[in-house]
């Protein structure tokens, strides 16, 4: 096999485009796959929120119930089905078998299911149920009342974890060599943010078309068809890119040699069940502190997002207006994320160290969270002051909530994720592999469902999102305090572990010289 000669990159090119010309055959279709998956992820995320929050008899209070009672069980059921299919089908057939049902559902939803919603939804039964049950269970009744929208929400939520985390990264890690990954994966991160810009603009365009719709036609129905048409086209491009890679890249020995790839892998990641994960976390203070960071982020974002979306519905009760705002929100998340990743992320960690990088996200969530909750809780008292800015307390709460979300997510992508991955570096191979598996099973799941569970409990006790907001603010402060303490303690362990590893490396280097 002749190896293509690779010249070293210049400083500017190594920063902007660290790809050799002959590698374009591999990296461009992978980039396109990643772009399509993340484009769909944004369109589906914003659409599912619009459907559930804007549905009749529903609101943001339905989200915690859907996440806990529908998304988590469906994710478990999917993994069981996936495990069975992976033993029967080839890897290529498995990819199509997993992706196709999503696209079929997203094609049927705007053309068949949504137009028949009045027939399919048990509105009268839900009304009777709502009259009997306490106000805190309105979210649970809303799921039944709009069950087809809830089904859309579940599949949209699963798209991210299934197609991105499982199918794409599983495929990419299998076919990408370590020296390629160091260069390719950073580009995929930029691709994700470019897709945010594209999908954000697309959502705004589709949502604004209501102005040209004739009277008597449901404008959101038209927007929904356009959004899902874009999702289907993007999904088909994704499938075509995957097919092309299998046909043209994986048959080229320059890019893929199964035997060589197997040698390069340092052992498979152990599959840990929930019990094993808990035991491993309990035995390792280092991994436990790292898990607390992940759990704290998941809970904090969840607590603020649902309250923000409830304010958003009050400001934009019309589905098209709500969707247009979410499109703009996604667009600006992409813009800010790119700027922070390029000019802030790496520089903060390099100049100020791991701890500063790890503390930026919780401090950002704390400061913006305090301002947001203050505007929601003290809305009436602040109306005179807010009027000086030419707006209303509600609109200001919506804008501050959007800024809070954008900054929190941008710093998460640029700094939180980087410091989290850096924390694994000083660990030995077993700790790295088992620790990552434990955090994937426990921390990721607890972060998402923990916030939903807290909100469900408060909704049942308080009766509405407005009534529970002061308690949410107190819980947020408590969780952030745990986050800050955990990061500070982990920093001490990280520095000690790093020094120990450097000492071991220095001893290994000096051993041949002294002998």
Swiss-Prot record:
GO terms for molecular function: ATP binding; ATP:ADP antiporter activity. It is a multi-pass membrane protein. SUPFAM superfamilies: MFS general substrate transporter. It comes from the Bacteria. It holds the Pfam family TLC. It is found in: Cell membrane. Belongs to the ADP/ATP translocase tlc family. This is ADP,ATP carrier protein 1. It comes from Chlamydia pneumoniae (Chlamydophila pneumoniae).
């Amino acid at each position: 096999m002749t190896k293509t000669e690779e010249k070293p990159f210049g400083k500017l090119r190594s920063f902007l485009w660290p790809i050799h010309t002959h590698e374009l055959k591999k990296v461009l279709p992978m980039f396109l796959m990643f772009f399509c998956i993340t484009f769909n992820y944004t369109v589906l995320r914003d659409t599912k929120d619009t459907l559930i929050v804007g549905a009749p008899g529903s609101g943001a209070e339905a989200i915690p119930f859907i996440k806990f009672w529908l998304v988590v069980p469906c994710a478990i059921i999917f993994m069981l089905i996936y495990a069975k299919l992976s033993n029967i089908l080839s890897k290529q057939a498995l990819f199509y078998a997993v992706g196709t049902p999503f696209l079929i559902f997203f094609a049927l939803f705007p053309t068949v299911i949504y137009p028949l919603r009045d027939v399919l939804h048990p509105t009268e039964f839900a009304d009777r149920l709502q009259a009997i049950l306490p106000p805190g269970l309105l979210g649970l009744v809303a799921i039944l009342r709009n069950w087809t929208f809830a089904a859309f929400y579940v599949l949209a939520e699963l798209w991210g974890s299934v197609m991105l985390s499982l199918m794409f990264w599983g495929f990419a890690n299998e076919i990408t060599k370590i020296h390629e990954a160091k260069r390719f994966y950073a580009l995929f991160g930029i691709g994700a943010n470019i897709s945010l810009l594209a999908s954000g603009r697309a959502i705004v365009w589709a949502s604004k078309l209501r102005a040209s719709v004739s009277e008597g036609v449901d404008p959101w129905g038209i927007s929904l068809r356009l959004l899902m048409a874009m999702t289907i086209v993007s999904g088909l491009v994704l499938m075509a890119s995957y097919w092309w890679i299998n046909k043209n890249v994986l048959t080229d020995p320059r890019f893929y040699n199964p035997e060589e790839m197997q040698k390069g892998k340092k052992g498979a990641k152990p599959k840990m069940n929930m019990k094993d994960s808990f035991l491993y976390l309990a035995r390792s203070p280092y991994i436990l502190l790292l898990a607390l960071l992940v759990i704290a982020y998941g809970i904090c974002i969840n607590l603020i997002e649902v309250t923000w979306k409830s304010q958003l519905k009050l400001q934009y009760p019309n589905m098209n207006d709500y969707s247009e705002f979410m499109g703009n929100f996604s667009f600006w998340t992409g813009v800010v994320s790119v700027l922070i990743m390029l000019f802030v992320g790496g520089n903060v960690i390099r100049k100020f160290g791991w701890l500063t990088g790890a503390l930026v996200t919780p401090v950002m969530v704390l400061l913006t969270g305090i301002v947001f909750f203050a505007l929601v809780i003290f809305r009436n008292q602040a109306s005179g002051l807010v009027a000086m800015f030419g707006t209303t307390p509600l609109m200001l709460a919506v804008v501050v909530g959007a800024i809070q979300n954008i900054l929190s997510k941008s710093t998460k992508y640029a700094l939180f994720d980087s410091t989290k991955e850096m924390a694994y570096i000083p660990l030995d191979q077993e700790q790295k592999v088992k620790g990552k598996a434990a955090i994937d099973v426990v921390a990721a799941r607890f972060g998402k469902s923990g916030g939903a569970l807290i909100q469900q409990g408060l909704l049942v006790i308080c009766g509405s999102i407005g009534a529970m907001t002061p308690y949410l603010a107190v819980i947020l402060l408590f969780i952030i305090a745990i986050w800050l303490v955990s990061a500070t303690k982990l920093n001490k362990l990280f520095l000690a572990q790093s020094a120990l590893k450097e000492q071991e490396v220095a001893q290994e280097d000096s051993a041949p010289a002294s002998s």
